[in-house]
From Swiss-Prot:
The gene is ccsA. It comes from Anthoceros angustus (Hornwort). This is Cytochrome c biogenesis protein CcsA. The lineage of its organism: Eukaryota, Viridiplantae, Streptophyta, Embryophyta, Anthocerotophyta. It is a multi-pass membrane protein. Required during biogenesis of c-type cytochromes (cytochrome c6 and cytochrome f) at the step of heme attachment. Belongs to the CcmF/CycK/Ccl1/NrfE/CcsA family.
């Protein structure tokens, strides 16, 4: 009873903290640019990750088996994976846009598991003999991280496509690389307009007459303001492209190991390596899409929009494979949730 109460407490805390972090990241992007507020969001996710880890360990100790036997447990493991992805990406990028996307998915996943699923599906059950296999641990512990990484990568490339939607019309600077010196001036806010000393506006005001100086000063402000926006947008698109490719590559690795270990497990349980189960078929489709994306990045050297268009379809396919195929009471992977 104590373990069950502890599990419920950890479940509610680990849902509230990603919700708080989502509000913090959105607030920092929209209206409040404060590093202390941003650190509050990151600390909330770290604490949520610890709470979910404690929840999983508590439930594991209570049920005496790996927590991957039903939809509720897989959702909790999925939320745990999303939090871990955010922590790793935050260490590497320091970009709140990644936090907005990843933390929001973690919150929705955790909320659906605790609120959307019936109480009966949240109870721990005894594993059937076919599931009592070490290959099950290998298979599911690889597939769940692939469910976390592949949708994250796909959502990042969707954000990339939205960011560069009208770049040829409104953001011509995105067509070429920007000198690193300009990057350091603009992105670190060392390029001031309208200040004192040796800045542009003061040199203009000391070398010309009134109206001409005002006109030139306004033109300079508009030009460099546009340049600053375009450079920041270029930096954002480069980070989205960088992280989406690496996250999708990591997800493809998890998916490959999961498919191979699943084939061995199915052969042990039912005597066949591949049975064209609905989820097996959609797993193969997902693997082919991710393989095409990695191939055109590594072999053809494509970057930006072209591989992003291919990868953008991965998010909907992965979620359909996870929920749409799992929900009906058909197939070896079914949880029968809709029934």
């Amino acid at each position: 009873m104590i373990l069950i109460n502890l599990e419920h407490i950890l479940a509610h805390i680990s849902f509230f903290l990603p919700f708080l972090a989502t509000l913090v990241f959105w607030g920092r992007i929209v209206c409040i640019d404060n590093k202390r507020i941003g650190s509050l969001g990151n600390k909330s996710i770290i604490i949520a990750y610890i709470c979910i880890t404690g929840l999983l360990l508590t439930r594991w100790f209570h049920s005496r088996h790996l927590l991957l036997s039903n939809l509720y447990e897989s959702f909790m493991f999925l939320s745990w994976s999303f939090c871990l992805i955010h922590i790793v990406s935050e260490i590497g990028s320091k970009n709140d846009w990644l936090g907005i996307i990843i933390v929001l998915i973690a919150m929705l996943t955790h909320g659906f598991a605790t609120v959307g699923l019936p109480i009966e599906m949240q109870q721990s059950t005894v594993l059937v003999p076919a599931l009592q296999s070490h290959w099950l641990i290998m298979h599911v512990s690889m597939m769940i991280p692939s469910y976390a990484t592949l949708p994250c990568g796909s959502l990042l490339v969707i954000a990339l496509l939205i960011t560069t939607l009208n770049k040829n019309k409104n953001f011509p600077i995105l067509k070429f690389n920007v000198n690193s010196f300009i990057w350091s001036l603009i992105l670190e806010k060392k390029f001031y307009l309208g200040g004192s000393g040796g800045d542009i506006s003061s040199r203009n005001s000391s070398s010309g007459n009134g109206s001409d100086n005002d006109s030139n000063n306004n033109n300079n402000k508009k030009t460099f303001h546009s340049l600053s926006i375009d450079c920041r947008k270029l930096q954002l698109t480069q980070q989205l492209d960088y992280w989406s490719y690496r996250i999708i590559s990591l997800g493809s690795l998890f998916l490959t190991i999961g498919i191979l270990s699943g084939a061995v497990w199915v052969n042990e349980a039912w005597g066949s390596y591949w049975s064209w189960d609905p989820k097996e078929t959609w797993a193969l489709i997902t693997w082919l899409l991710s393989a095409i994306h990695i191939h055109i990045r590594m072999i053809r050297g494509w970057q930006g929009e072209k591989p992003a268009i291919i990868a953008s379809s991965g998010s909907s396919i992965v979620w359909f494979r996870y929920l749409g195929v799992n929900s009906p009471e058909k197939g070896l992977h079914s949880y029968g949730w809709l029934n």
